[in-house]
Amino acid sequence: MFPSPVTTTPFSVKDILNLEQQQQGGLAPMELSSPSCMLATFKQEAFGSEPPALPELPEPPPAKPPAAFPGPYYVKSYGEMDTAKDSKADKKELCALHKSLEQEKRELEDPERPRQRKRRKPRVLFSQAQVYELERRFKQQKYLSAPERDHLANVLKLTSTQVKIWFQNRRYKCKRQRQDQTLEMVGIPPPRRIAVPVLVRDGKPCLGESSPYSSPYNVSINPYSYNAYPAYPNYNSPACNANYNCSYPAVQPVQPSAAGNNFMNFSVGDLNSVQPPIPQGNAGISTLHGIRAW
């Protein structure tokens, strides 16, 4: 190795160049040495000095077998995983997000601009042959099962949804027709005509000139006759209007008992001895005007 010159600045250009030269000079003898010399030195080091014996180490425990996982989850290693699909999905999400942001930006810029209406699906137009076949099948069967609907759709070259919607609309149309027919059969009764008297004509009351109002039902109201009782042949009517005077015999006073208590003692015979007076005249008069004689 060459002695390094004394330098005042260790980071000067000369110092850097001298360091490179020293590294090249140290590597040169190793490169020029023959391989036979290198082999001899290696053999001397290998047989001349034996390494110290290492202490015996315990044998490592046997490795546990890896846990059995289902195959579909570990088919590929991490290096073999396909990242192309993930990148495509990320690109699609970014594109959708970008479009939504642009749409919101446009709405904010033009708030008065009406939003675009969603385009409706075109209406399905059935051919005459398809309509004829559908009508013929509807007359036979108003409700179809799923296999029958699929078979009919394949025959008519339609989708199962189109056949289903057509049958729904046809059932609703048939129901409306039945409702209209029932309304026509029942009909609405004509309005009643009611006679109303004219009270004012040309600004003048016409109650006196008009004929008296007649009831549409021609019901005559008569005063209730009170003399509707049947006449008796043996009695005149003045006798019916006569006042009745009933006289009852006085009850004998009951003498108090010797004991002087507050109770009254009387017998049932005293009550039966009192007889009601017999009014003058026949008993039929007592039934007049709801009056009963006791």
Curated annotation (Swiss-Prot):
Q: Name one GO biological process term.
A: negative regulation of epithelial cell apoptotic process
**Which GO cellular component term is one of those annotated?**
protein-containing complex
Q: Which residues bind DNA?
A: 119-178
Residues folding into a coiled coil are none
| Region of interest called Disordered, as start-end residue ranges on this chain | 48-69, 102-122
Annotated GO molecular function terms are:
chromatin binding; DNA-binding transcription activator activity, RNA polymerase II-specific; DNA-binding transcription factor activity, RNA polymerase II-specific; protein homodimerization activity; RNA polymerase II cis-regulatory region sequence-specific DNA binding; RNA polymerase II-specific DNA-binding transcription factor binding
- Keywords of this protein's UniProt record, alphabetized? Developmental protein, DNA-binding, Homeobox, Nucleus
Q: Where is the composition biased (Basic and acidic residues)?
A: 102-114
Q: Which domain of life is it from?
A: Eukaryota
CDD domains, alphabetized:
homeodomain
The domain comment in this protein's record states:
The homeobox domain binds to double-stranded DNA.
Q: Which family does it belong to?
A: Belongs to the NK-2 homeobox family.
- Task performed by this protein: Transcription factor required for the development of the heart and the spleen. Implicated in commitment to and/or differentiation of the myocardial lineage. Binds to the core DNA motif of promoter.
Quaternary state and partners of this protein?
Homodimer (via the homeobox); binds DNA as homodimer.
Q: What is this protein called?
A: Homeobox protein Nkx-2.5
Q: Which organism is it from?
A: Gallus gallus
